[in-house]
Amino acid sequence: DPTPPPSCDVLIIESTYGDRLHEEAGEALTQKAQQLVAHAKAHKSKIIVPAFALGRTQDLVMRIKRLVAEGRIDPLPIYIDSPLASKVTDVFRKHPECYDEETFRTFTSEGDPFAARYIRYVSSPEESKRLNEMKGPCVIIASSGMCEGGRVVHHLKHGIQDEANIIAIVGFQAEHTLGRRLVEGWDVVPIFGIPTPRRAQVVVFNGLSAHADRNDLLAYVRAISPAPQ
């Protein structure tokens, strides 16, 4: 949660989602994750997750690890296929003093919040390519978050035509990006310039945005004490 701002005469804030509410949160997100994992296990399929290397990937890993620890979802192989995300995660590990209180407690009591026996960080291009030859169930988290470059595009190329696979969208997708076309439900999408049929299911998680929604923005402003006149 953000630290309440100090008293001020003028407050300028961002308002990316100032006109809407995030529809999903807490239990709704957990239930959707449970459904995806159950589907992947039942169909021995892959969950391909385009994710930003900074922040979003680490958040996803921590969320998944927490759900497994709580017995809310069954563990399955998770591959973090982004060299940049791996380097950023190392920075996160080295600076637990920057965490909020809850995350810091997890780090000190349970060890590395970004590691588990079922989590593997992929480094080499050769290992990344082998993921496309593997059978599921598994989760592949790779950048770029909007599917415009990076290793995730290769995973989409190899997995998008399998109707048992799932593409989980966990972040904002700008117009004219491959990610936005997936969200919009295009049946044929361009991958490396080649029109490619989409048979995989696309599931959108709306509650994971790093941007505050209307209620959160209002709560932030109302927390100013004393309130500006």
What is each PLM-predicted segment?
Residues 95-110, 225:
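A polyampholytic, Gly/Pro-enriched intrinsically disordered region
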Residues 27-29, 63-67, 93-99, 182-186:
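Short secondary-structure boundary/capping segments
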Residues 1-59, 65-72, 77:
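His/Asp/Glu-rich metal-coordinating catalytic cores
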Residues 65-69, 108-229:
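C-terminal regulatory/interaction regions
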Residues 55-56, 77-94:
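Short, conserved secondary-structure transition motifs
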Residues 70-83, 101-108:
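Acidic, His- and aromatic-enriched active-site or binding-groove loops in soluble protein domains
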Residues 13-16, 51-52, 81-83, 143-144, ...:
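Fold-independent oxyanion-binding glycine-rich loops
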Residues 1, 20-23, 58-59, 88-90, ...:
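Short helix/loop capping segments that flank catalytic or ligand/cofactor-binding pockets
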